[in-house]
């Protein structure tokens, strides 16, 4: 129960700030793709640091630091966005976009690492589906809250709500870590440098047809999703402009963008929940996992 509740809380916090991230990012207009490049570079740079920190610190201390650090950083963005204007404010929004995109990767990765360390394989098979449903419910709640409050709170204020969400997740994280039987790292010897471990992982990936197949599947899926994603943002950039317009119009259009993305997230997660609960198991039994993935 605590695992599902924590995942719901974390995804709820993320979906409180995700529409604001998108609304700010669209302001980049023709150079929107650079934000994706910035996210890729930031993720690549952060990965060895993340690997080093996971190897160096106990998981409970590192998890606390990551989620609390995320909350403090979001509070900093809330302050910075309120104290700037014009091009400088847009720049803060672009940095916020890259930060949130990178945070989403590591916050989710860390959660599932904790789950993998804390549950035996037989227990994991029974519980991980339930935990995933909990995350979807949290995403629904966060999206619904943004949509409900979009006429009352500004997109900037959603950042502060997200900061509160990540900070308050510690009240679920600490008892969860105490209840899991195996959250400590399994080895106590010297750890290999993160770069060496990354290279070893790359060699293993290149030698395994199974891993290569998964990689190609994910690459193709991501390529198609990226194309649709960028095209939809290009449409909104022109439909709801925030550049070269009056400040009041820019603010109103930013609010409209935020509400739009919240509703998209709400619909997406509602469909995902229905599929998780009623369709996935049946489709796997009827079609087989390979055919189901190919159809996607």
Predicted regions located by residue number:
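Membrane-embedded alpha-helical bundles of multi-pass transporters/translocases
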Residues: 1-187, 192, 198-296
């Amino acid at each position: 129960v605590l695992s599902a509740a924590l995942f719901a809380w974390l995804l709820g916090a993320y979906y409180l700030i995700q529409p604001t991230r998108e609304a700010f990012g669209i302001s980049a207009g023709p150079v929107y793709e650079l934000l994706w490049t910035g996210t890729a570079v930031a993720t690549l740079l952060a990965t060895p640091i993340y690997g080093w920190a996971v190897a160096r610190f106990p998981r409970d201390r590192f998890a606390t630091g990551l989620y609390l650090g995320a909350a403090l950083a979001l509070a900093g963005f809330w302050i910075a966005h309120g104290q700037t204007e014009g091009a400088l404010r847009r720049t803060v929004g672009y940095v916020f976009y890259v930060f949130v995109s990178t945070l989403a990767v590591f916050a989710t990765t860390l959660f599932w690492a904790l789950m993998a360390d804390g549950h035996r394989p037989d227990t994991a098979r029974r519980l991980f589906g339930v935990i995933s449903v909990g995350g979807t419910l949290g995403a629904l709640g966060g999206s619904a809250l943004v949509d409900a409050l979009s006429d009352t709170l500004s997109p900037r204020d959603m950042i502060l709500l997200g900061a509160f969400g990540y900070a308050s997740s510690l009240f679920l994280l600490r008892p969860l870590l105490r209840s899991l039987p195996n959250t400590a790292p399994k080895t106590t010897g010297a750890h290999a440098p993160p770069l060496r471990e990354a290279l070893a992982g790359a060699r293993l990936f290149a030698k395994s047809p199974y891993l290569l197949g998964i990689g190609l599947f994910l690459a193709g899926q991501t390529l198609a999703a990226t194309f649709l994603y960028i095209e939809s943002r290009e449409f909104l950039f022109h439909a709801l402009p925030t550049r070269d317009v009056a400040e009041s119009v820019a603010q109103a259009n930013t609010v409209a963008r935020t509400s739009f993305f919240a509703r998209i997230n709400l619909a997406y997660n509602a469909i995902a929940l229905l599929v998780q609960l009623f369709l996935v198991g049946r489709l796997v039994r009827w079609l087989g996992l390979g055919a189901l993935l190919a159809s996607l």
